[in-house]
Amino acid sequence: VQTGDISEERLNESVRRILTLKEKRGVLNFDPSARTAEKAEEAVGSSLNRDLERKIAAAAVTVVKNEDNTLPFKVQTGDHVLLLGAFENEVPGLNLGMRRLIADGVLPKDTSFVAKNFTKESTLDSLKEDLEKATHIVVISEIGYEGQLDKDFWRTKIPTEIVNYANTNHKKAAVLSISKPYDV
């Protein structure tokens, strides 16, 4: 404002917009002492919290391709789901998601699953035992830049081999593309 780059009117408009949003969200009169660990533990994981998580997640997903109406998976009693992440740090989230889906009745109670990650040392043969047991396969493709699309790059090669295996063996498979959309 002092240098004239932004007018005082423009600054006031921005402040008004921010304050209006804060008022709408109920954070103008934020009282940190009202936020306790007990209240947080009560809210996180609650039905309301879980419903909101699902709505946000559903709004964030874009289905690019759905051949043969594979999605959503129709997991039946006794089915086995294999989830393969590109990195070890993805496995806890995959496990949590499956446990929640089973606990919430979205998947049958006797659905079994394995969540693990593949690495650049992984081969189709090293994953074969898990692939053979699976009725449904979810593999994460995590491509961060265009150069990783090379067919021999492990984060491209392994998901491709897994999907080819699933197609050959009549198993339902989905690729979950995260990171940048180069692999889409």
Language-model features, listed with the residues they occupy:
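Preference for extracellular/luminal or secreted protein segments
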Residues: 1-184
